[in-house]
Amino acid sequence: MIMILYWSLPMILFILGLFCFVSNRKHLLSMLLSLEFIVLMLFFMLFIYLNMLNYENYFSMMFLTFSVCEGALGLSILVSMIRTHGNDYFQSFSIM
């Protein structure tokens, strides 16, 4: 029973984060926050899975390191976008 709770809660929160990421496309900051929430839920599911199989947590630390680098890269893109465009509206940003 407790294992179902361990797996269902992160899955529900992961799906909720995906829904927020897809539906909230107005500001880049809100998209980055929902993306970090998705990565946090993936880390939580990976941690539960590795502990269930009695593996070491080395891979989870590597995953956490890469997710921190992804967050820093997203913040640097946000700062450069605010400096060049003056706001973080995602519709005003053209990739081309």
From Swiss-Prot:
Disulfide bonds: none annotated. Its EC number is 7.1.1.2. The keyword Manganese does not apply. GO terms for cellular component: mitochondrial membrane; respiratory chain complex I. It catalyses: a ubiquinone + NADH + 5 H(+)(in) = a ubiquinol + NAD(+) + 4 H(+)(out). One of its GO terms (biological process) is ATP synthesis coupled electron transport. Its main location: mitochondrion. It is a multi-pass membrane protein. Keywords: Electron transport, Membrane, Mitochondrion, NAD, Respiratory chain, Translocase, Transmembrane, Transmembrane helix, Transport, Ubiquinone. Pfam families: Oxidored_q2. The chain crosses the membrane at residues 2-22, 28-48, 62-82. It is found in: Mitochondrion membrane. GO terms for molecular function: NADH dehydrogenase (ubiquinone) activity. Core subunit of the mitochondrial membrane respiratory chain NADH dehydrogenase (Complex I) that is believed to belong to the minimal assembly required for catalysis. Complex I functions in the transfer of electrons from NADH to the respiratory chain. The immediate electron acceptor for the enzyme is believed to be ubiquinone. Belongs to the complex I subunit 4L family. This is NADH-ubiquinone oxidoreductase chain 4L. It comes from Drosophila yakuba (Fruit fly).
